[in-house]
Curated annotation (Swiss-Prot):
One of its GO terms (cellular component) is cytosolic large ribosomal subunit. This is Large ribosomal subunit protein uL16. NCBIfam families: rplP_bact. The keyword Chaperone does not apply. SUPFAM superfamilies: Ribosomal protein L16p/L10e. It comes from the Bacteria. Coiled coil: none annotated. Binds 23S rRNA and is also seen to make contacts with the A and possibly P site tRNAs. The keyword Transmembrane helix does not apply. Part of the 50S ribosomal subunit.
Amino acid sequence: MLMPKRVKHRKQFRGSMAGKATRGNKITNGEYGIVALEPCWIKANQIEAARVAMTRYIKRGGKVWIKIFPEKPVTHKPMGVRMGKGKGALEYWVAVVKPGRVLFEISGVPEDVAKEALRLATHKLPCKCKVVSRADLEGGESNEN
């Protein structure tokens, strides 16, 4: 599971997901990618499930890049515990994703295989996503509908 090796502060505020992604919104390594269409938190196990779905479909060919990393800790208090008495224990790690962020990239496989692998991966993610090519994003179609 993805998580930071060490962190300065074990517990964080929830923060906000307002606005669009200003960084990580271009395809840099691969030929095709998944772009988020809405803001969400993506858990480490969801990222891993999407990666496994893609790599199993493309078998031995191609290369996959994971462009997000779960660096935000999320805490929960146990069931039936009253309010107060401090913040809850660390439960899991999430990657904060804004609209327009490229989540995964893939290359080295034919177009139909790449698009199907990315489509399978989008079903493992909690937010609406679309499959795009490098030409789509460079051609000015980066704005969402």
